[in-house]
Curated annotation (Swiss-Prot):
Protein name per its UniProtKB record: Guanine nucleotide-binding protein G(q) subunit alpha
Start and end residues of each stretch annotated as G4 motif: 270-277
Record's function text: Guanine nucleotide-binding proteins (G proteins) function as transducers downstream of G protein-coupled receptors (GPCRs) in numerous signaling cascades. The alpha chain contains the guanine nucleotide binding site and alternates between an active, GTP-bound state and an inactive, GDP-bound state. Signaling by an activated GPCR promotes GDP release and GTP binding. The alpha subunit has a low GTPase activity that converts bound GTP to GDP, thereby terminating the signal. Both GDP release and GTP hydrolysis are modulated by numerous regulatory proteins.
Annotated residues for binding of Mg(2+): S53, T186
Region feature (G5 motif): 329-334
Species of provenance: Homo sapiens
GO BP annotations, alphabetical order: adenylate cyclase-activating G protein-coupled receptor signaling pathway; blood coagulation; entrainment of circadian clock; G protein-coupled acetylcholine receptor signaling pathway; glutamate receptor signaling pathway; neuropeptide signaling pathway; phospholipase C-activating G protein-coupled glutamate receptor signaling pathway; phospholipase C-activating G protein-coupled receptor signaling pathway
Tissue: Predominantly expressed in ovary, prostate, testis and colon. Down-regulated in the peripheral blood lymphocytes (PBLs) of rheumatoid arthritis patients (at protein level).
InterPro entries per UniProt: Gprotein_alpha_Q (IPR000654), Gprotein_alpha_su (IPR001019), GproteinA_insert (IPR011025), P-loop_NTPase (IPR027417)
Lipidated residues (S-palmitoyl cysteine): C9, C10
Family per similarity comment: Belongs to the G-alpha family. G(q) subfamily.
The record's account of how the chain is modified after translation: Palmitoylated by ZDHHC3 and ZDHHC7. Palmitoylation occurs in the Golgi and participates in the localization of GNAQ to the plasma membrane. (Microbial infection) Deamidated at Gln-209 by Photorhabdus asymbiotica toxin PAU_02230, blocking GTP hydrolysis of heterotrimeric GNAQ or GNA11 and G-alphai (GNAI1, GNAI2 or GNAI3) proteins, thereby activating RhoA.
Classification lineage: Eukaryota, Metazoa, Chordata, Craniata, Vertebrata
Effect of R183Q: In SWS; found as somatic mosaic mutation in CMC; also found in melanocytomas sample; somatic mutation; shows significant activation of EPHB2 compared to control
Length: 359
């Protein structure tokens, strides 16, 4: 065998090895691409206090590790702070709305609670417990609570204030429902990934207040689905940032902007009409037609009201080929969210079967 033929033979062995390595790299790249495609990015959008953070907490309960006692203990201080924040908001509103206290001694209680620096609150003890209990039982404060649409008050106010004995117990440990109800405005971006049927769902919650929205822009790449939350109960409320703008009009304007963004041409849109429980309560005394004169349905009818609100949002969609999937929800109700998200998951997977190699 000549030297040339020996070298050619060696070279072809090297070439074969190089090709084998190259093929393996190509295969790995294809695998990586396929695996990357098995991650679905769900962007949670909506105005402030529409229920986005509560929805993420539910995903942790339903599809994640939930909340251990240690995790729940971490919310104790926030529950106390929510109680003080709510009572201070009502005390301020008593002045603004010129509502008198029925019981004279509650003026001193109000002064005591008013002077608390909420951010420094880490305990819930007397004299504050008795002061807040006494205030909550004052008919003046109850009238003020009934007029809450005229100022900003957390949806969880009644939930906590009706349960002060339990929360004031020295051995208090927040329940799962306490955790779901606690209000902490989202600043920045919160991501929650969870695994379902060998697909990673990456849920991204961005702050809803106006100042937070400019931070959204870089979340817009490769979004599988937009999940847009609307608080049904906000039809008669004004914005935190601007007290002459209707919250639902703001939500409609944001939805219109989002669904016409070029980034989202290929993203499915799922509309969650949230806080259906609060709508059912409120519609009995606050009439939709007073805020949306075009409503011509019956008064005190939650079903008619929510269908009207759904139509208002769906009509904002300029693309007749784009389907808007919608669900009525109560984000603090784990079973409701479990049921709704199972349907949403199936919709998303169906829409992405080929794209994500799920068939």
């Amino acid at each position: 065998m000549t030297l040339e033929s020996i070298m050619a033979c060696c070279l072809s062995e090297e070439a074969k090895e190089a090709r084998r390595i190259n093929d393996e790299i190509e295969r790995q790249l294809r695998r990586d691409k396929r695996d990357a495609r098995r991650e679905l990015k769900l962007l949670l959008l909506g105005t402030g206090e529409s229920g986005k953070s509560t929805f993420i907490k539910q995903m942790r309960i339903i599809h994640g590790s939930g909340y251990s006692d240690e995790d729940k203990r971490g919310f104790t201080k926030l529950v106390y702070q929510n109680i003080f924040t709510a009572m201070q908001a009502m005390i301020r509103a008593m002045d603004t709305l010129k509502i008198p206290y029925k019981y004279e001694h509650n003026k001193a209680h109000a002064q005591l609670v008013r002077e608390v620096d909420v951010e420094k609150v880490s305990a819930f003890e007397n004299p504050y417990v008795d002061a807040i209990k006494s205030l909550w039982n004052d008919p003046g404060i109850q009238e003020c609570y009934d007029r809450r649409r005229e100022y900003q008050l957390s949806d969880s106010t009644k939930y906590y204030l009706n349960d002060l004995d339990r929360v004031a117990d020295p051995a208090y440990l927040p329940t799962q429902q306490d955790v779901l109800r606690v209000r902490v405005p989202t600043t920045g971006i919160i991501e929650y990934p969870f695994d379902l049927q060998s697909v990673i769902f990456r849920m991204v919650d961005v702050g809803g207040q106006r100042s937070e929205r400019r931070k959204w822009i870089h979340c817009f790449e490769n979004v599988t689905s937009i999940m847009f939350l609307v608080a049904l109960s906000e039809y008669d409320q004004v914005l935190v940032e601007s007290d002459n703008e209707n919250r639902m009009e703001e939500s409609k304007a944001l939805f219109r902007t989002i669904i016409t963004y070029p980034w989202f041409q290929n993203s499915s849109v799922i509309l969650f009409l949230n806080k259906k429980d609060l709508l059912e309560e409120k519609i009995m005394y606050s009439h939709l037609v007073d805020y949306f004169p075009e409503y011509d349905g019956p008064q005190r009818d939650a079903q008619a009201a929510r269908e009207f609100i759904l139509k208002m949002f769906v009509d904002l969609n300029p693309d007749s080929d784009k389907i808007i999937y919608s669900h009525f929800t109560c984000a603090t109700d784990t079973e409701n969210i479990r049921f709704v998200f199972a349907a949403v998951k199936d919709t998303i997977l169906q829409l992405n079967l080929k794209e994500y190699n799920l068939v």
